[in-house]
Every structure is written in structure tokens, then in C-alpha cells.
Amino acid sequence: MDTALIKDFFDCCREAKKILELLPPLPQGLTPRHIQIIDTISQLEEKNGLVKISDISTALHVTRPSITRLVSELAAAGYAQKAGSATDGRVTYVALTNKGKSCCDFYVKRYHNWVSSQLTGIKPDDLICAAATIRSFYAALKNSEPPKL
């Protein structure tokens, strides 16, 4: 493959990262990663009812310790609540508080609706293709060893 295309793709990835930086200002102490966790909890609650730390970990392909830390931060800030399973001490359930649901409504649902209204010139198939390309590119490289100096 032409290395100029690879360079252009990397440049576009850097621009794509800037898109995430266009989020409205987040409440103090929250990061875009926290918003992603809140969104995932919301989706899993709608789909399954009860949400476990392991469910979030599986959905996001992130280690359980990382999710546990992020959920603990959300709980400490009042966006989520944690509860241990009555039958299995290894299981922790997570639910959004009203504060977490409001955060999800604004930073995910309302913001995504606003973004959608701004993209009138972009076809859905173009977004599908862009997302598929990024996922394929990542999958091709994630387990490869880059060259060493």
C-alpha cells in the first residue's frame, strides 16, 4: 500500500481525535472516558436491567480493574452507585443515579442529536465506511510488533 495514503490516514485520525475534544465542557472531574462508561451503563441497563462491572468491561474491551476504577470514580462523584451481589461476592452491580442519567441525556443523547443535525452533507453510508475502515485498521495493527530502532 502507498505510504502516502497511510500518512494521510494517520493525519485524519489525529483530526478525528480533535472531534472528541469538541464536546461541551464536562463537569469538573469527568473525562470523555467517564462519559463513555456512563453511556455504556445506560445502554446495558436498557438492554439487560442489571449491569455488572464485567458487562461494561466486555462491552468496551477494557480490563475489569480499569472499569472498576472508573466506576468507583463515578460513584464517588454521584453519577453511579455500586452494590455487591447478595449471592456472589465477586460480582458488583452498577446503576446510574439520577445525576448519571441526566449526564447521559445531555452529553450523549442530546449532544449526538445536535451533531447529527450538523452533518446534513454526510451520507450515512460514508460514516459506516469510515467506522469500518478505522476498526479494520486497528484490528490489523493491534497485535503486531512495530519495527525497532
Regions found by a protein language model. Give the residues of each.
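Helix-turn-helix DNA-binding elements, focusing on the entry/boundary residues of the two helices
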Residues: 53
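Charged, amphipathic alpha-helical coiled-coil/dimerization segments
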Residues: 72-129
